[in-house]
Each structure stands twice: as C-alpha cells, then as structure tokens.
Amino acid sequence: VYITNAGDITLSPKGVEMAHVNNVRLYVHGERWTASQPGDWGSQWQVEAPIFVDHGYVSQDCYYPIIKGRSVITNQGFVTAVDLGIRRVNNNWGQAIIRVGSAEACPAAGHPNAVFEFHYDGTFYSPGNGHFNDVYIRSDGRLKINKKELENGALEKVCRLKVYTYDKVKSIKDRSVIKREVGIIAQDLEKELPEAVSKVEVDGSDVLTISNSAVNALLIKAIQEMSEEIKELKTPLFTKIARKISKYFKF
C-alpha cells in the first residue's frame, strides 16, 4: 500500500498496481484482470470479477444490493437512489434487479420505486411502459416447423372478442391504478386463440400475457376472410347462378 503526501492511495499486491484511490475516484486496473482470464462464456459461472461481492448464504425471500448510488437536486430535494443487486425467491434461481426510486421514504408512504427484473431464463420485467424506435420479433420461416395454415373462422373469432376500457393496476397483489387503458382481455383471447396467450409468474402470482404478433396474424386472417365475402357480394347474380349450375352440368 502506497500513500502519497496528497493523500492518494495505491494498492499494489505483489508489486503490481491494482487500484488507485484519491479524493474524487476509485480506479481499478481491469487490464490486470483480463490478462489472467480467458474471457469465454462457458467458464463465467465460476469466475469472479475485478470488484466482487459475495453475499453468502441468505434467506429464502430477500434482496441485497451490490452497488448503489444516490443524488439530490439542490434546493429542490427529490433524493433518488439507483442500485443493482440480487433478489432471491423461494426454491428458485435468483434475479438481477435494477431499482430506481425515492431515497426519502418507502413505497408504502407513496414514494416512487421502480423495480426492473432480469430473470435467469432471459425474461425481463418492467413496471412501466417501454418506448422504442421499433421492435423486431423473430419470424423467419426457417425457424418454424410443422406449419399449418390457420383454418377459416378468424372473422368469427375476432367478432366474439370484446374491447374494454379499464383501469390497469400494478399487479395481482398491488391494486394501485397505473392508468386508464383500452384493449382486450387475455382470458377472452385464450378461448379463441390459445396460441396467443402465455402464462408468467409475477410476484408469486400467475399472470396471462398476450402475443401481439399472434393477434396481428388473427386480424390478417380475418381481413382476408372479409375480403372474400366482399368479393362474393360484388359478384353478379347470373355469375353465381352459373357457378351453381356448373357443379351439376359439364359443358
């Protein structure tokens, strides 16, 4: 350990500088780490990191931050904290959590607290809306096997679906209202097109979700059926009669 007259501290285990601390920052020489690591995905399960926090044994339902930051606007307040940590739930793998919210009081006191969840299976949960330039969903035909064209009846399915206006609440347990929305109900869609509905677990409760891609496909099929019906309505009467006669007589 080296300490300068200016108060800077350098950590140099075995004579190799690993970290430098002064009154404004902590600097870690990550290149020392990379020089001794393969950097492959396969071994990451057993690899630590230049800065490593081991929480050890914890309870079945808990959350502990790994790193946290906080700031406050001068003369205004709004003390806000952001942290990254690990959440544990009973009998399951952990979740990575990014939490953004008030550092003045708890959510029960009415202060904001957004929790973003990253699950071990790749699932991501956000408590609010997502705003993107665009969203692309994999739909390459080479990724789809056992294809079968959807049978007629899509128009009837769409007509049976009801559109509601409703208040959207945060979760099954937290009934506080997020905002007023308009849309369809997953349980209704499941009766008509079960492939469009999936079930996920949120805070210990099963919640139904809807695939917009599947709904769009159903609407496309319904429009195609409606187009055929319109064509039939526009067909002259004598043409319809000729079609029926042609089924019984060959000319």
Swiss-Prot record:
It is found in: Virion. One of its GO terms (biological process) is virion attachment to host cell. This is Long tail fiber protein Gp37. It holds the Pfam family Peptidase_S74. Its main location: virion. The record marks 139-140 as: Cleavage. Belongs to the S16-like long tail fiber protein Gp37 family. Proteolytic cleavage and release of the chaperone in the host cytosol stabilizes the folded protein. Transmembrane segments: none annotated. GO terms for cellular component: virus tail, fiber. Residues 139-237 form the Peptidase S74 domain. Keywords: Host-virus interaction, Viral attachment to host cell, Viral tail fiber protein, Viral tail protein, Virion, Virus entry into host cell.
